[in-house]
Amino acid sequence: MIKLGNKIIGEGQPTFITFEAGPTHSGLESAKRLVKHAALAGGDAIKFQIFDPDELIADKNLLFTYDILVDKKTGKTEKISEPLYDIFVRRSMTESEWRELKKYSDSLGLAFFATIGDNLGLELVKSIGCHSIKVA
């Protein structure tokens, strides 16, 4: 048996459900909405990706092109191009924001997991008390 957060994982226990939020938020309030919906849906944990855009993106001018839905009824999309660095900056948070998000997850009974890719991320997740860490 393994205990993650307030849940026991093992034989005879209910399936442990982790919601993968990754870097899909656009800041603290958006991330809190993801946590809230994961809890409302009956999740046991939520996992985010924690990174430093300056460490992750070498070429700050590298463009990324993607489609956004502009009309739900017709399915019409529009192409957007922007620096990949800017996208990652929007999806990064400060240490205090990560602490607040972890506390919010705890208050809703969700274990808080994180994927990290560098030593700074490791120190952060250890300091905020992540229940599980994935190294990418």
Predicted regions and their residues:
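Glycine-rich, proline-tolerant flexible connector loops at the mouths of alpha/beta enzymes
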Residues: 44-92, 121
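Glycine-enriched alpha-helix->loop->beta-strand junction motifs that scaffold or abut catalytic
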Residues: 42, 126-133
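Glycine-rich anion/phosphate-binding loops
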Residues: 24-40, 93-96
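Catalytic beta/alpha-barrel core
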Residues: 87-93, 110-118, 131-136
